[in-house]
Structures are given as C-alpha cells and as structure tokens.
Amino acid sequence: MAITRASFAICILLSLATIATADYYAPSSPPVYTSPVNKPTLPPPVYTPPVHKPTLPPPVYTPPVHKPTLSPPVYTKPTLPPPAYTPPVYNKPTLPAPVYTPPVYKPTLSPPVYTKPTLLPPVFKPTLSPPVYTKPTLSPTVYKPTLSPPVNNKPSLSPPVYKPTLSPPVYTKPTLPPPVYKKSPSYSPPPPFAPKPTYTPPTKPYVPEIIKAVGGIILCKNGYETYPIQGAKAKIVCSERGSYEKSKNEVVIYSDPTDFKGYFHVVLTHIKNLSNCRVKLYTSPVETCKNPTNVNKGLTGVPFSMYSDKNLKLFNVGPFYFTAGSKAAPATPRY
C-alpha cells in the first residue's frame, strides 16, 4: 500500500509540473507544427554468414571385389545312341462288314394345294332414295269484290269554296314485312365414285431352300473279303444336255475322303437341277484295291432322275466297290 500511495503522489507532482511549465498561446497566433526528427540510436546490424566446418572426413568408396568360388562349366557333347526306327505293322481290321440298310423317308406333310379364291364384285346399294320433285297444285285465285256497285245519283253541288286549311301531305315509306323464303326440298349428293377393286392373288409363304446332299459307302472287294476303305473319294458329274445329245457346261464336284467306315457325304448347294447329275467312283488310297467296278453303277454313275421323290434331303447311293483284280465284283454284295 505504501508503494502505491507514493507512486500516486509522484504522478500528481509530475502532472502539476507539466501544467506549470506549459506555454500558453494567445488565441490570435495559431500553433506551428514541427514534425519530429527520428534519429536511430542503434547502429544497423551487420550480417555475417555462418561458417560451417565439417568435423568428419569425406567417405571414401571402395568397390567390393567378387571372387568366384566355382570353376567355369565345361560343355561336352552328349553321346546319344542313334534312334532305332521300327516301322508300324498295319493289320487288317477285324471288324465285321457293315450291313447297310437304306433309310425310308416318308413325308409327313402333304404338299399344299393353292386354290384361287372366288371373289364376287361388290354391289353398291344406295341408302337414300333419289328425291322426287312434284309440281305444287295451286288453285287459281278468285277475287271477290267486297263493295257494292256505285249508284249514280245526281249530286247537288254548290260551287266549291277553297279554303286552304290542310297542311301539305307528309309521305312516309311503307314498312313492309321481311320476305319469307321457303326451303327447297333437301337433296343429298350421290356417293363418290369408287373404282372396282382389283384382285391381287395371295402371296405364297416363304419356303426355305432345301439343302440336299449325297451319301454312300465305298468298300473293297478282295476275293471273299469285303471291308470299308478309308480315304476314298467319289465325284458328282452334272451336265446340261444340248442339241444332238451333246453335253455342255459340265460341272464336277469331288467328295471329302471317306471315314473309317467308308462313308462319304457331299452337300449340293449351288446346283438347282439335280436331274442331270450322276454319282461315280473317283479314287482309292489302297494300292492293292484301286480298280473301280460298275457294281451299283459305280462307273457309269447313279442318276438322280431315278429318285421320284423330289423333296428328299439326302440321296443314298451305292455301296460302290473297288477290287484288286481286273474282274468286277458281283452285282449283289455278300458279307
């Protein structure tokens, strides 16, 4: 508390001293403002960059030295024994001869019969009767006078005395009632002219093209043995007959090699008329069985015209035979 009172007393004394020493200006002279001059009391700092002295020496890199512990490999050529080739031994297959039964195709649907519809020409009956115009029956007008005939009496007239007592007449337009028009009898125009309908035959439904193919079996007849030939081929020869029985535009199609059962299959897509086509034997890969025979027309060719059903998708021919000798195999094969 003593310190606070002493400091308060010192502040009061200093304020009184400043009031006593203050100059009082006369109200006539305005004060002159002088800007203060600020002089730095401290010198400007001088920047000295720090000097870093490394305390450790720079590292020295010594690359490692790798010493192989293994000796380099020595390559020597392998001494392999020469391969011994043993040719395969082909034995005749011990399969029984297949018995081929040609399938019988029975059409399940009868061919459609197109009949032309009998259309009767339309008869247009008017729904309204034509108007009948009748002349109006008008009775002649008879005018009957309503006045009796005048009686001529001799008037006793005095001489007229003219007195202008009447005003001049005023003419007014008569007001006539509006005319009444009678409606004419109602007349409906006839129906517009309609041309006769043209008959358009019904369009036939779209029938997709039937893909036809040829299939058969090629066998080898060697004595009394008969077995199928794998890799044999047949050919289809198609020609168009010209004048004097001369063929022209002959097309030959070769089948794919037969399978292990001796079966071949050929798809005929680009030939429309199959009646001039024949199926014949072509080649056999078996050296001991390469002579074609005419059994089931294997040489002359099986014509497609012998098939009466034109809706067949697969034509089965054969079986055809190759033989080892020059003699042909029997006409009826025996298994």
Curated annotation (Swiss-Prot):
Subcellular locations according to the entry: Secreted, Cell wall
Which Pfam families does UniProt cross-reference here? Pollen_Ole_e_1 (PF01190)
Q: Can the keyword Secreted be found in this entry's annotation? A: yes
Q: Keywords, A to Z? A: Cell wall, Repeat, Secreted, Signal
Q: What Gene Ontology cellular-component terms does the record carry? A: extracellular region
Q: Where is this region: 39 X 5 AA approximate repeats?
A: 30-323
The UniProt function text for this chain reads: May contribute to cell wall structure in root hairs.
Q: Which named protein is this?
A: Proline-rich protein 1
Organism of provenance: Arabidopsis thaliana (Mouse-ear cress)
